[in-house]
Amino acid sequence: PGFLMGQIASFLGAGFLGGMIGGYLAGYIALFIRNHLKVPKWAEALMPMMIIPTLSALIAGLIMFFVIGNPIVWATNALTNFITGLDQSSKGVYGFIIGALGCIDFGGPISKVPNLICDGLLLEGITEPEAIKVLAAMVPPLGITFSLVLSKVLKKPIYAAQEVENIKVAFPMGLCMISEGVIPIAMNDLIRTCICTATGCGVTGAISFTLGVGSKVPSGGVFVIPAMSNPLAALIALLAGTAVTGVLLVLIKKRRTGDE
């Protein structure tokens, strides 16, 4: 059923929104059928392989074609036209929002929403949000690593010994666009860390969008920067966000010593 919803969305021109909504619709209909449809004993074995998929695909397909298809097409076109019609100042604002939300919980459920939208826009041929997603995902681990280096230079220790070891692991993960490595570090000072990393990611997103950086590759970290439409601007955006994150962390985190 989910595959069929994707094909219907493509046929209608509903884009990624149509595929996403259609997939959820088919899934919930299948769940409803499984929980509420009673069949004879001899047909129970057919439920998971034939009855549920057939009925859910039929019902969801009819709803997509005749009820929600056209509104989704309109919403997809409106979103595409809105993104492509942004001026430079607006790009900075929306780039900041996309970047900040895309890493606010280090790859958790909140960041999945804007990242999914970026992936969908990539399917529509809009590559700038995808570049923000790739670059911003690297900022938390790189920014925290930079804050460790900066704190040593300024002789203001802000991380305990175990956190330092975790940062050594998080840094190479961050280069590969895996921001989850900073979660053990962030959990020790969650609010301050989230504020600093979200700000840094927002700066990266704003610079990237304003300078027109685009990425046709949805993942890969630093290894896909050469494939972006403006690699130098992408590198500038990444370094700027990293620097902002690191400086803010050194400024607002409390001094720590040893394994405190």
Please provide the spans of the model-predicted regions.
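Pore-lining transmembrane helices
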Residues: 1-41, 49-259
